[in-house]
Curated annotation (Swiss-Prot):
Cofactor(s) this protein cannot do without: Zn(2+)
CC cofactor note: Binds 1 zinc ion.
Superkingdom to which the source organism belongs: Bacteria
Record domain ATP-cone: where: 49-139
Protein name per its UniProtKB record: Transcriptional repressor NrdR
Matching InterPro entries: ATP-cone_dom, NrdR-like_N, RNR_NrdR-like
Keyword Zinc included in the entry's annotation: yes
Gene Ontology molecular functions: ATP binding; DNA binding; zinc ion binding
NCBIfam families per UniProt: transcriptional regulator NrdR
Functional description taken from the UniProt entry: Negatively regulates transcription of bacterial ribonucleotide reductase nrd genes and operons by binding to NrdR-boxes.
Lineage, uppermost ranks: Bacteria, Pseudomonadati, Pseudomonadota, Gammaproteobacteria, Pasteurellales
Gene: nrdR
HAMAP family per record: NrdR
Residues in unnamed zinc fingers: 3-34
Family the entry assigns: Belongs to the NrdR family.
Amino acid sequence: MHCPFCSTEETKVIDSRLVSDGYQVRRRRECTKCHERFTTFETAELVVPKIIKNNGMREPFNEDKLRRGIQHALEKRPVSADDVEKAISHITHQLRATGEREVPSKLVGSLVMEELKKLDKVAYIRFASVYLSFENINEFSNEIEKLKD
């Protein structure tokens, strides 16, 4: 791998460990020329199904869009970046595991809600209020009551 500091091709791995529940390998590397250290992440490149939007349009799965949506729901909540990445990896893994070439966006929304429910109840309600299109306070109350069970 090329050194990001001096562009030489000679780098060596000084530490490797599994992260994201074993779906990624984190490698600590050192350049043999300039001796700078840097971190790389390695993941298997697998096909993620296309997303069928509610209007019938199809678009490629966009992990950045998923991340932005989850981070928006979690804004100012005490959830670590590592936990967010684990949730994203879990959702992506579940989408791949369907074995389908295309999946409805509703499936992605449901998977996000499941992960947010585990991460942070407030973020779950924030996301659910938009995703489920709450129109009045009773719908909020009903969803909050479900969380208490």
